[in-house]
Amino acid sequence: MAPKRNRDDDFVLTLSDNEGEDLTNVIEEELPLDPSSNKKRKRNDDIASTKKSKKSKKKSEDEDVEEEEIWGIKDADDGAMDSDFEFALEADGKGGADLEEFEGWGFDGAKKGLNGGDKKAVDIDEIIARRREKKKATGKKGEAEDEVIAEKEDVVASDEEQDAPEEMDFEDEDDEFMAEDGFGMGAGSAEESGAEEDSEASDNEGAEDDDSDNDSVASPAPHPDDAASEASDDDEDIDEDPEEAAKREAFFAPEEKPVKGAKPELNSTFQSMSLSRPILRGLATVGFTQPTPIQSKTIPVALLGKDVVGGAVTGSGKTAAFIVPVLERLLYRPKKVPTSRVAILMPTRELAIQCHAVATKLASHTDIKFCLAVGGLSLKVQEAELRLRPDVIIATPGRFIDHMRNSPSFTVDTLEILVLDEADRMLEAGFADELNEILTTIPKSRQTMLFSATMSSSVDNLIRVGLNRPVRLLVDSQKSTAGTLTQEFIRLRPGREGKRMGYLLYLCANVYTDRVIVFFRQKKEAHRARIIFGLSGLKATELHGSMSQEQRIKSVEAFRDGKASFLLATDLASRGLDIKGVDTVINYEAPQSHDIYLHRVGRTARAGRSGRACTIAAEPDRKVVKAAVKASRTQGAKVVSRVIEASEADSWSEKVDEMADEIEEILKEEKEDKILAQAEMEVRKGQNFMDHEAEIKGRPKRTWFESEKEKLAAKKLGMEELNGVVGGKKKGKLSNKDKKKLDDKGERLEGRVWKKGRQERDGKGVLAKEKGKKKVKGGKPAGLGKKKAMKPMRTGGAKRR
């Protein structure tokens, strides 16, 4: 017969801290055991009791030992405390977490998207090492031949010594020192000693001048054009265009005026901004303890969903200023259906990869997904990620449009936030067409945020972006540098522009020897400098647009990890790139504009650290140097002038000239290696086409919104923005002033040319004498007569006698 069920059996009992013993007693009372198994149960209970007694003795001994130790030191996590709870560690009394120093941003997010394959890039270091090995091999052969010749000479000399008499033995001391009255000895000794004294004195004076120049504030040399340009600049500052000011007032949202008697809101900490705990944990992970001025101003406004136009100096934390509010808003998104809601556009691939690394670190304690869509990485990998509808897409404009037109799983109808980093560059001619294509496709009702260190104040450019009464947040004065930056200028006198590479090599070999970025205007100059640095024994790597994405990532990582001391780059690396520990920036020549100069020198002196920027400037760079010095003086930044001895620069220039043939041979060998690699790639491409012909032909053709001609025109405009008009000014009718300049230039190149004087114009002088010499005895001029000269010459007949 089944046991009788209790009425309370249907209830599910809960456990509490004080009900453990009572509940076990109740269960034992309500569930009686079968009487047939009582004997067996008793035996088992006896055995268990003996085991329990032994265990209890051991436990009592262990408890006695544990009482002597610190309580809880060896306990595992029992889940009693919330895992998200954090203790606020005090660091120097400021409330910041005392964390380990953050190591910097990596390129791990981009590596998974690199195109796989066995494509091997041409390595300059390998070519230089190969040539050195060949030289060593040939040198060893030459040394062996010299040793054989020397041995033969020694044998002949020993035979002669044996035949010579003993009186002919010479002392070594007489061989080392010649007599004072010998040939050439003592001649001009006074002059030489005087010259040595003068040189020593001049060296001491030069050293004093260098010390004084390094510590003195540079004053630009007076120039006839400076006065007029300064006057025009002052007029522009004073007479602001009232129409532009009215446009600006109507376009931007009015500034919030503080209420009288109310305390101003100070967002001195991230906790005071009411950010979520996962975001605060992400900020602590990367070592952000206190918000920068641009962050404390931008984050509260961006959290309200308003459009923002932000500007601050380089290295002030603008990336985190727009990523933190984006992540905070995404924490409260609907999560049932995955949707792409944010697009962040960058002008360069490296900047987008870095922004992806920053966003991933800050969102490491959330479930927000990111996708990196930049050129040079695998399209298939990016399409697979976009198919999962990531929350944030970080991209360059070209690849974003490519996916927008050719990836069927990617839609932009759900975008709610658009961010343009380095917005002034994005609004320039090179990116204008691509940006217009994106803005006309994405939804109009969105939040738009623009950030840059040199933010444009032109309302016409900002209207194109579709901003809706944006809030203007400019922390620092426009076109200013970091306060911890020291700017140096090296002036090249007229006629010494060709020695520029000598000055650069002297700086890199003797003054700035590690953690240096050198900027060039053109890719070919950066590549040639890379070869010269390799031949000079300086560890360098290059970064420019002619390199593949894999090469570019490897170059930046080699410089970041300390494998290379110098990064030779074009303006590709001038914007946004944050590499930890960059001490110095050198401008091989001044850039096209002051804005580009600010971005270049902003690669150092970031986040409160000190740094130096050195510019090698010639006469054509006067305009940019003058603007930089004027802005720095207005700001109160330190500007110094560095003087390098001409002899030092000349010696390095001579070394470069000696390398000219070897540089050309290396370039030729590199070109041959590239042609071979290209041929191998074409062979593999043809083989793949033969193996997968049906699949390749079945793929839909990729489309673009511009023709090839329009793409080339846009590319040309972008180059002109960076380097100016390549072909010079457009040809037109020359003024008399320009003609005079050209004539003077031609005379300087040709040397002094004889001109007519007053006597020659009056028919006298040298010309009259020359005319008299040309006449013959009969008074007729020499040469053919008039009628004879008019006759045509025979072509086929017999010769006249």
From Swiss-Prot:
- Where along the chain is ATP bound? 312-319
SMART domains hit by this protein: DEXDc (SM00487), HELICc (SM00490)
Q: Where is the composition biased (Basic and acidic residues)?
A: 1-10, 735-770
Gene Ontology CC terms, in alphabetical order: nucleolus; preribosome, large subunit precursor
Instruction: Specify whether Iron is a keyword of the entry.
Output: no
Q: Where is the composition biased (Basic residues)?
A: 785-801
Where is the protein found, in the record's own terms? Nucleus, Nucleolus
Enzyme Commission number(s) from the entry = 3.6.4.13
Kindly give the Pfam families that the UniProt entry links to this protein.
Answer: DEAD, Helicase_C
Give the compositionally biased regions (Acidic residues).
Answer: 18-32, 156-179, 193-214, 227-243
Domain of life of the native organism: Eukaryota
Domain called Helicase C-terminal: residue spans:
503-682
Any one biological process term the GO annotation gives? ribosomal large subunit assembly
Q: Find motif (DEAD box) and give its ranges.
A: 421-424
Q: What is its main location?
A: nucleus
Signal peptide stretch: none
**Molecular function in Gene Ontology:** ATP binding; ATP hydrolysis activity; RNA binding; RNA helicase activity
Under the heading SUPFAM superfamilies, the entry gives: P-loop containing nucleoside triphosphate hydrolases
For the motif Q motif, what are the positions?
268-296
Region feature Disordered, mapped onto this chain: 1-79, 97-120, 132-244, 726-801
Keyword Nucleotide-binding set for record: yes
Family according to the record: Belongs to the DEAD box helicase family. DDX27/DRS1 subfamily.
Assembly and binders: Associates with pre-ribosomal particles.
In Swiss-Prot or TrEMBL terms, this protein is called ATP-dependent RNA helicase drs1
